[in-house]
Amino acid sequence: MTSRRMLRACTHPTIAVMLVLMGLIPTVGSAAAVPPRSPVAGPVPVSYLDLNRYLGTWNQLAAVPQYFNLVCARDTQATYARDPQGNIAVHNSCITWANTVNEIDGTAVVNDRQTGAQLHVSFPSVPTQEGVEGPTNYIVTALGPDYSWAIVTDPTRVTGFVLARAARLDADGWQQVRAEIAAAGQNACLYLTSPTTGGETRILPLCLL
């Protein structure tokens, strides 16, 4: 529900190589080399998400690279608001490498009424993702006690986003975030920092920050 499903994916060869090295794109023969794995339990959501406190604008400070966010050069944001149907209106935006604004609107529906932290996010303009109702693809696995930051992934842990109200986190904040990423069963080295105006300007693995 952040820069997720951003349009016009980047296909630069160096990015493709980076994704191969990070294990996000399988290489020839990799399927035969890796033995089948036992089923792994999905990420655990936070015990309770106060949606009213979660509404508003979030800055993406780091993310696991995906085709839909490679178009973004800096200042990736997600803004959430209640819609007339009682769901959550999603507005994602970023500044592209061409210094233009890339944006998309969608809807989030709460699937887990007990915690409020598992949702289905849809985007009408994206093929196969038009349906407002659907399986969970957005799980809030960690929150700052004051809702100053959040970590989001999906049931397969393929995606990952570090969101914050401010454009930057201090060293203690990043330490907490890395610990929570590990607790969710993910590797902080697969997250790359997302440049923000007034915050981190480099793109580097979160484990090296």
Question: Where is each model-derived feature located?
Answer:
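A beta-rich soluble binding module of mature secreted/lumenal proteins
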Residues: 2-209
